[in-house]
Amino acid sequence: MSVRALSHVAVGVRDMDRSLAFYRDVVGLAVTSDRVEEFAQGAEQAPAQRRAVYLRWGDGPHSSYVVLDQHLTKETQGAAIPLFDAGIHHFAFWVDDLDAALERARDAGFDVVLGGGRAVGSEWLGEPEGGRPVRSAMLRDPEGNHVQLDQRV
């Protein structure tokens, strides 16, 4: 068995419009589906409804997705995990133009936690020393999740 790609990351949201603006307009993901779905909550509970927006990056049969899930039957609970705590505390996307993405984020009022400073070596990617450096920035999405943007320089 081999892993071909990441299938999807599902993000529970309270404000779909604001979250959609972040992942579509700032990060640059493409909306492929926006629908209301019924889903099972467990054997003892009635089915519930959610609004699910699928945003794709990459092409081909192994594209990856962010799925924004908004519970429509009850109020969404929970909070984002602080950076570097146990659990998935951030995820990252490769972007073509980090400065443009940061400008879009700031213009839309999103929180830039660490902003695109100096480039660092790419050894952390398992590449040989002297590989193409990477610039990174850390943003917070509308739910408080940390989202990193990386650009090769």
Write out the residue ranges for each language-model feature:
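Structural preference for beta-strand elements that scaffold enzyme active sites
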Residues: H8, Y65-V67
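Core segments of cupin and vicinal oxygen chelate
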Residues: V11-S63, A100, D107
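Active-site beta-strand termini and strand-to-loop segments that position acidic
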Residues: L55-G60, A137-P142, R152
